[in-house]
């Protein structure tokens, strides 16, 4: 927009006219006053001509020797500069005419005075004095008119200045003050968030019109921006409320994991918290192939979302979920899946720690047995050897008793060594499949038979105590097959039934066994049965139709009801 009449130019023009009018009126008045400075002198000199005229008549009548001197004085007074300067263009004609008549008549009178013509002088002196009076009167009127002119010019200048000031102020009021007041009012309304003020007048041809147009555009843009910011603030507020709700959910989930023992109940509680707060239709945590817990019922009309449950790049399982608002639930469930991964990691860490405690305790027992019972058995073997040497060989009864005693002592020593080996079992893995693989790899070095493993038993179904008992049963069964079955292949398989029952099979392709009976003084099978009872299960021996031996351990974990397939 082009500014046609800028405020600065309009104000400058108005002030210029005011100053110009002031200068003109003041200048004319000053010039007029300057020209009046010697008016009084001119009037005085003109008035003195009357007295000098009478004095010349007296000198002429009395024959005074000063007549010529007085004539010269009159001549000087009549032609004084203050009177001769009256012959200018701005002096009224009446003044100049009167002055010209005085000069002309003075020539005649001066001539008569030089001739001494007293009668003529006396006859014309009064007329000449009257002319002087008229000249003085003309000078007086001229001076008065100049004063009136000064007054008139000053009055006209004052009226002109007042008029210019009035119109300037009026214009400033309409074109500057009023628009500025509107701008102030509109600014105050905008300050209070009110953008519905009437549009400002944009028709003004000055900067304020341009400012009003720009302000209207700014107000419109601010209105749009303000509404946009309000919408953004509302959105951010909703996001903050949503984030707060999610943090509360995550806090509740973290509190569910903040227990001394992380088990399946903790994971189910987490799924319940998420389902209650996120309104998810279905949640399912899968760990391995045979262990999962779920909340809700799956909806076939909704897609199943899957998130990996990981910790330190290790995948522990998957989190399946269904929700009608996938985008809003996904960030929370990502965090929940990470939390479940940490929970599974700490579950295995706790189990590993408990296993280490058990292993340390069993190693301590093994050391105590070795330091006590093993030393006693060794001492008995030495004493038995000495006793054999002291008994005659022809004493058959004593020799038979000594042979039985020696056999029993050897069996006790062998069983003690096996027991010490069992107590010194060390495993570095916390989850059941890895622990079984580690144990079988160790046994594989002791046999030519092929050891295979198929473990589908969920590690979360067992705590550390149960897992150690199960490992010991499997180890004892595999060792028995290695020693007595003459087998070329020994297979270990672990499965979980849909009802939550777990079964471990140790099968070999060896010679098979009949009724499982232990020789007198052997307790391996009894120990295996006792361990199975501690698992809350049963130990059975059978001969499959294909030959060999099948050892079965069936049990139900403490959380068996939680690990059913749902």
Swiss-Prot record:
<dbReference type="InterPro" id="IPR016380">
    <property type="entry name" value="Sig_transdc_His_kin_NarX/NarQ"/>
</dbReference>
<dbReference type="GO" id="GO:0046983">
    <property type="term" value="F:protein dimerization activity"/>
</dbReference>
<dbReference type="GO" id="GO:0071250">
    <property type="term" value="P:cellular response to nitrite"/>
</dbReference>
<keyword id="KW-0418">Kinase</keyword>
<keyword id="KW-0067">ATP-binding</keyword>
<comment type="function">
    <text>Acts as a sensor for nitrate/nitrite and transduces signal of nitrate/nitrite availability to the NarL/NarP proteins. NarQ probably activates NarL and NarP by phosphorylation. NarQ probably negatively regulates the NarL protein by dephosphorylation.</text>
</comment>
<keyword id="KW-0547">Nucleotide-binding</keyword>
<keyword id="KW-1003">Cell membrane</keyword>
<dbReference type="GO" id="GO:0000155">
    <property type="term" value="F:phosphorelay sensor kinase activity"/>
</dbReference>
<feature type="transmembrane region" description="Helical">
    <location>
        <begin position="14"/>
        <end position="34"/>
    </location>
</feature>
<keyword id="KW-0812">Transmembrane</keyword>
<feature type="transmembrane region" description="Helical">
    <location>
        <begin position="147"/>
        <end position="167"/>
    </location>
</feature>
<keyword id="KW-0808">Transferase</keyword>
<feature type="topological domain" description="Cytoplasmic">
    <location>
        <begin position="168"/>
        <end position="566"/>
    </location>
</feature>
<dbReference type="Pfam" id="PF00672">
    <property type="entry name" value="HAMP"/>
</dbReference>
<dbReference type="InterPro" id="IPR003660">
    <property type="entry name" value="HAMP_dom"/>
</dbReference>
<dbReference type="InterPro" id="IPR029095">
    <property type="entry name" value="NarX-like_N"/>
</dbReference>
<keyword id="KW-0534">Nitrate assimilation</keyword>
<dbReference type="GO" id="GO:0042128">
    <property type="term" value="P:nitrate assimilation"/>
</dbReference>
<feature type="domain" description="HAMP">
    <location>
        <begin position="174"/>
        <end position="227"/>
    </location>
</feature>
<feature type="topological domain" description="Periplasmic">
    <location>
        <begin position="35"/>
        <end position="146"/>
    </location>
</feature>
<dbReference type="InterPro" id="IPR036890">
    <property type="entry name" value="HATPase_C_sf"/>
</dbReference>
<keyword id="KW-0902">Two-component regulatory system</keyword>
<feature type="topological domain" description="Cytoplasmic">
    <location>
        <begin position="1"/>
        <end position="13"/>
    </location>
</feature>
<dbReference type="Pfam" id="PF02518">
    <property type="entry name" value="HATPase_c"/>
</dbReference>
<keyword id="KW-0997">Cell inner membrane</keyword>
<dbReference type="InterPro" id="IPR005467">
    <property type="entry name" value="His_kinase_dom"/>
</dbReference>
<feature type="modified residue" description="Phosphohistidine; by autocatalysis">
    <location>
        <position position="370"/>
    </location>
</feature>
<dbReference type="GO" id="GO:0005524">
    <property type="term" value="F:ATP binding"/>
</dbReference>
<dbReference type="InterPro" id="IPR011712">
    <property type="entry name" value="Sig_transdc_His_kin_sub3_dim/P"/>
</dbReference>
<protein>
    <recommendedName>
        <fullName>Nitrate/nitrite sensor protein NarQ</fullName>
        <ecNumber>2.7.13.3</ecNumber>
    </recommendedName>
</protein>
<dbReference type="GO" id="GO:0005886">
    <property type="term" value="C:plasma membrane"/>
</dbReference>
<keyword id="KW-0472">Membrane</keyword>
<keyword id="KW-1133">Transmembrane helix</keyword>
<dbReference type="GO" id="GO:0071249">
    <property type="term" value="P:cellular response to nitrate"/>
</dbReference>
<dbReference type="Pfam" id="PF13675">
    <property type="entry name" value="PilJ"/>
</dbReference>
<dbReference type="InterPro" id="IPR050482">
    <property type="entry name" value="Sensor_HK_TwoCompSys"/>
</dbReference>
<keyword id="KW-0597">Phosphoprotein</keyword>
<dbReference type="Pfam" id="PF07730">
    <property type="entry name" value="HisKA_3"/>
</dbReference>
<dbReference type="GO" id="GO:0007165">
    <property type="term" value="P:signal transduction"/>
</dbReference>
<dbReference type="InterPro" id="IPR042295">
    <property type="entry name" value="NarX-like_N_sf"/>
</dbReference>
<feature type="domain" description="Histidine kinase">
    <location>
        <begin position="364"/>
        <end position="559"/>
    </location>
</feature>
